[in-house]
Amino acid sequence: MSKPIYVLSGPNLNLLGTREPEIYGHQTLDDVRRLCEARAKSLGREIVFRQSNHEGELIDWIQEAREKACALVINPAGYGHTSVAILDALKAVGLPVVECHLSNPAARETFRRKTYVSLAATGVVSGFGAASYELAVEAAAGLAR
């Protein structure tokens, strides 16, 4: 069996469906997980889907992916704008990385328009709500090693 695609979500994404639904939509993180699993299955892939509000835990999972994953999808949420540590972990992992955002950061507040994660990402998918994750999984499957 081939290695899975890791799909990692950062802080506050556990609140999807209730937190600012006018920006992030009404689907829950569990809904997003099911969409990703279905897309991966249709592509002959599996995923490992995780969320954490803790930077260190996300870094641990990124480092774990180095040996256990074929590609990585990450929605860093707020950490995208602040975490050089996550950037460094992504650069060290040696895997294709697809950055994913539910909203379009370029169309939001100035501080959201740049992410450190983009410096390590092979590509970025944003602005399509929960479908951003599906598209990111599809891209990661195409890039997988």
From Swiss-Prot:
Q: Where is this site: Transition state stabilizer?
A: R19
Query: Could you say which residues bind substrate here?
Result: N75, H81, D88, L102, S103, R112
Provide the E.C. number(s) assigned to this enzyme: 4.2.1.10
Q: Which GO terms describe its biological process?
A: amino acid biosynthetic process; aromatic amino acid family biosynthetic process; chorismate biosynthetic process; quinate catabolic process
- Report keywords, A-Z: Amino-acid biosynthesis, Aromatic amino acid biosynthesis, Lyase
Q: Where's the active site on this chain?
A: Y24 (proton acceptor), H101 (proton donor)
Q: Which GO terms describe its molecular function?
A: 3-dehydroquinate dehydratase activity
Would you say which domain of life the source belongs to?
A: Bacteria
Q: Name one Pfam family in it.
A: DHquinase_II
Q: Which reaction does it catalyse?
A: 3-dehydroquinate = 3-dehydroshikimate + H2O
* CDD domains associated with the record: DHQase_II (cd00466)
Pathway given for this chain reads: Metabolic intermediate biosynthesis; chorismate biosynthesis; chorismate from D-erythrose 4-phosphate and phosphoenolpyruvate: step 3/7
PANTHER family, A to Z: CATABOLIC 3-DEHYDROQUINASE
Q: Which family does it belong to?
A: Belongs to the type-II 3-dehydroquinase family.
State whether it acts alone or in a complex, and with which partners, per the record: Homododecamer.
Q: What does this protein do?
A: Catalyzes a trans-dehydration via an enolate intermediate.
**Which NCBIfam families does this chain map to?**
aroQ (TIGR01088), PRK05395.1-2 (NF003805), PRK05395.1-3 (NF003806), PRK05395.1-4 (NF003807)
Name-wise, this protein is: 3-dehydroquinate dehydratase
